[in-house]
Curated annotation (Swiss-Prot):
Keywords: Cytoplasm, tRNA processing. Heterohexamer, formed by a dimer of trimers. The hexameric TusBCD complex contains 2 copies each of TusB, TusC and TusD. The TusBCD complex interacts with TusE. Part of a sulfur-relay system required for 2-thiolation of 5-methylaminomethyl-2-thiouridine (mnm(5)s(2)U) at tRNA wobble positions. Belongs to the DsrH/TusB family. The gene is tusB. It comes from the Bacteria. Its main location: cytoplasm. Transmembrane segments: none annotated. It is found in: Cytoplasm. Signal peptide: none annotated. This is Protein TusB. One of its GO terms (biological process) is tRNA wobble position uridine thiolation. GO terms for cellular component: sulfurtransferase complex.
Amino acid sequence: MLHTLHRSPWLTDFAALLRLLSEGDELLLLQDGVTAAVDGNRYLESLRNAPIKVYALNEDLIARGLIGQISNDIIPIDYTDFVRLTVKHSSQMAW
C-alpha cells in the first residue's frame, strides 16, 4: 500500500499512521508532510523503525527550504516517480 502524508506530522494522528503500516508499504511525504523528513525529529525516528521505504517529494522540500536538512534515510523523488509509485500500488491511504 502507498501511504501519502500531506499534512505536518504534528497535525496528524501519526500514531495511527504507524499502526497501519505493514512490511512492504511505502510512504510518500509531500506538501507539509515533508517536515517529517528533517533529520533529528521524533517522527523520523519512528519512520526509521518501520518496515517501509520513505520518500519525499523533492519539489516540496525545495519549496520549504529543507534541502540539506533531510535524513539520508529519506529518498527524494520527483513527480514522475510519484506517478510510478501510484501505479505500483493498487491501494493508497492519504493522511
